């Protein structure tokens, strides 16, 4: 929005040309989302406390979690509002990719909101019935995948970029839709599973979003993409603004979500953020790199799959509790230790993911 205003005002005063610089808007997008989160965070927390919108803690989990009961939740509303406002202010709103990501964020946020609303406000322990949750995730994810497939303007936009391999660029065809669906829905649920400790999900999300800002920049830049031998997709440049908005909103939320948390993001935040990372990975053609950089999310999801599968087939559990972060808590690790070590793992994996830009 402000990009258009800046372009108009440039004819009267050349200093407004700064609004056309992507790097400038990326920095301001981060700061805008950060400011919104920090400013409205305390107000939202007080409102949630007043309305008694607090977290319900499982009685079969770690005993240390009992003290978290009643902590305000649905703080993801703050994250989503910060992202959307910042993107609307600083992104080029004529870019269809920007609107695709906003659609996914808001849509998955609505699904998460309904789930949180039923659990926290209507006191329905099950929240949104699982089959309905996955139904709406499927509708949104599949419709997004189909839309992207049909608006693709060239082979670069539907090819699979394989990390560490220079010449391998297989065309996916209609399989692009299937893969995109699983990336969006899978990442959404993976982040949701990871969101079980204070700050555990938001920091890896910030790291991955920050890395994707770089991927979006080089993919959208004709010279950098040629130098790094990655497919050039011009529209991805504006995703830098979306990624930096996620970083800013995430940092602002972390201020209140760090141990001991004053607020939890709830499903409204985790489902939306995960879906956002998924669709951004698809747009910049880095689905496999997301699998690397989001390794903590993958690890949490695999631990649940293994736990459930083992119990159903053998009647035995592999872990003391799943997702795996609870396993380490029950082994006696203090919560901050689990959180920080998972952050360290995430940082290492993000650096490996960034290395794929050059190591081919």
Swiss-Prot record:
Signal peptide: none annotated. It is found in: Cell inner membrane. Catalyzes the initial step of the lipid cycle reactions in the biosynthesis of the cell wall peptidoglycan: transfers peptidoglycan precursor phospho-MurNAc-pentapeptide from UDP-MurNAc-pentapeptide onto the lipid carrier undecaprenyl phosphate, yielding undecaprenyl-pyrophosphoryl-MurNAc-pentapeptide, known as lipid I. Its EC number is 2.7.8.13. HAMAP family: MraY. Pathway: Cell wall biogenesis; peptidoglycan biosynthesis. This is Phospho-N-acetylmuramoyl-pentapeptide-transferase. It comes from Colwellia psychrerythraea (strain 34H / ATCC BAA-681). Belongs to the glycosyltransferase 4 family. MraY subfamily. Keywords: Cell cycle, Cell division, Cell inner membrane, Cell membrane, Cell shape, Cell wall biogenesis/degradation, Magnesium, Membrane, Metal-binding, Peptidoglycan synthesis, Transferase, Transmembrane, Transmembrane helix. One of its GO terms (molecular function) is phospho-N-acetylmuramoyl-pentapeptide-transferase activity. It is a multi-pass membrane protein. GO terms for cellular component: plasma membrane. The chain crosses the membrane at residues 18-38, 73-93, 94-114, 134-154, 168-188, 199-219, 239-259, 263-283, 288-308, 338-358. Pfam families: Glycos_transf_4, MraY_sig1. Its cofactor is Mg(2+). It is an enzyme of class 2 (transferase). One of its GO terms (biological process) is peptidoglycan biosynthetic process. It catalyses: UDP-N-acetyl-alpha-D-muramoyl-L-alanyl-gamma-D-glutamyl-meso-2,6-diaminopimeloyl-D-alanyl-D-alanine + di-trans,octa-cis-undecaprenyl phosphate = di-trans,octa-cis-undecaprenyl diphospho-N-acetyl-alpha-D-muramoyl-L-alanyl-D-glutamyl-meso-2,6-diaminopimeloyl-D-alanyl-D-alanine + UMP. It comes from the Bacteria.
């Amino acid at each position: 929005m402000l990009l258009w205003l800046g372009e108009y005002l440039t004819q009267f005063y050349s200093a407004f040309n700064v609004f056309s610089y992507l790097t400038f808007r990326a920095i301001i997008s981060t700061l805008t989302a950060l400011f919104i989160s920090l400013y409205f965070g305390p107000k939202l927390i007080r409102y949630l406390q007043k309305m008694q919108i607090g977290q319900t803690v499982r009685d079969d989990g770690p005993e240390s979690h009992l003290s978290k009961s009643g902590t305000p939740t649905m703080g993801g509303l703050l994250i989503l509002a910060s992202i959307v406002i910042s993107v609307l202010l600083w992104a080029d709103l004529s870019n269809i990719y920007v609107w695709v990501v906003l659609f996914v964020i808001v849509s998955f946020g609505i699904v998460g909101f309904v789930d949180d609303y039923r659990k926290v406000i209507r006191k329905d322990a099950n929240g949104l019935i699982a089959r309905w949750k996955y139904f709406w995730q499927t509708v949104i994810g599949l419709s997004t995948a189909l839309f992207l497939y049909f608006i693709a303007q060239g082979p670069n936009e539907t090819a699979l970029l394989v990390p560490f391999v220079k010449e391998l660029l297989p065309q996916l065809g209609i399989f692009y839709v299937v893969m995109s669906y699983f990336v969006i829905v899978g990442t959404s649920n993976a982040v949701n599973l990871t969101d079980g400790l204070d700050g555990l999900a938001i920091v890896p999300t910030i790291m991955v979003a920050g890395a994707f800002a770089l991927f979006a920049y080089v993919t959208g830049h004709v010279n950098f993409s040629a130098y790094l031998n990655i497919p050039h997709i011009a529209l991805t440049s504006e995703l830098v603004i979306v990624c930096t908005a996620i970083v800013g909103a995430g940092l602002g939320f972390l201020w209140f979500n760090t141990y001991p948390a004053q607020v939890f993001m709830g499903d409204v935040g985790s489902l939306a953020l995960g879906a956002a990372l998924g669709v951004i990975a698809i747009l910049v053609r880095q689905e496999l790199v997301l699998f690397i950089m989001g390794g903590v999310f993958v690890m949490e999801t695999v631990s649940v799959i293994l736990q459930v599968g083992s119990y159903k087939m053998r009647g035995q559990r592999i872990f003391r509790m799943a997702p795996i972060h609870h396993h380490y808590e029950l082994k006696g690790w203090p919560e901050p230790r689990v959180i920080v070590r998972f952050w360290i793992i995430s940082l290492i994996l993000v650096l490996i993911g960034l290395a794929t830009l050059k190591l081919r």
